[in-house]
Amino acid sequence: MGNMQGMMKQMQKMQKEMQAAQRELYATEFEGKSASDMVTVKFTGEKIMKDIQIKPEAIDPDDPDMLQDLIIEAVNQAMGTIDKETQDKMGKYTRGLPM
């Protein structure tokens, strides 16, 4: 019976650590930039966009596709960083668990 209580305490501790890591991750701000820093985006760890900065020279009325590509590049970079950081922080808690 004592072994079961020990396991429960260990699981509760792990759950608290996991929640703290998740709160820290969600509070972190992640940035993504396009080529030449023409577009910069900022996201929370929950993948909520908080800011976008576009340099005036990125806005060419004759080439809207360029601006779209720059935004996509910056957003994808930020999302990749968030995903990597999430895996680094949370992966230790989910390793070995059936999904």
From Swiss-Prot:
User: Which positions carry the signal peptide feature in this UniProt record?
Assistant: none
Molecular function (GO) terms for this protein are: DNA binding
Keyword Cytoplasm attached:
yes
Instruction: For this UniProt record, give its keywords in alphabetical order, as a comma-separated list.
Output: Cytoplasm, DNA-binding
Known InterPro entries for this protein?
Answer: YbaB-like_sf, YbaB/EbfC
What Pfam families has UniProt attached to this entry? YbaB_DNA_bd (PF02575)
| Gene Ontology CC terms | bacterial nucleoid; cytosol
Q: Which Cys-Cys disulphide bridges does the record give?
A: none
Taxonomy, superkingdom: Bacteria
Where is this chain's protein located in or outside the cell?
Cytoplasm, Nucleoid
Quaternary structure? Homodimer.
Family, similarity comment: Belongs to the YbaB/EbfC family.
Q: What does this protein do?
A: Binds to DNA and alters its conformation. May be involved in regulation of gene expression, nucleoid organization and DNA protection.
This chain's protein is named: Nucleoid-associated protein LCABL_24440
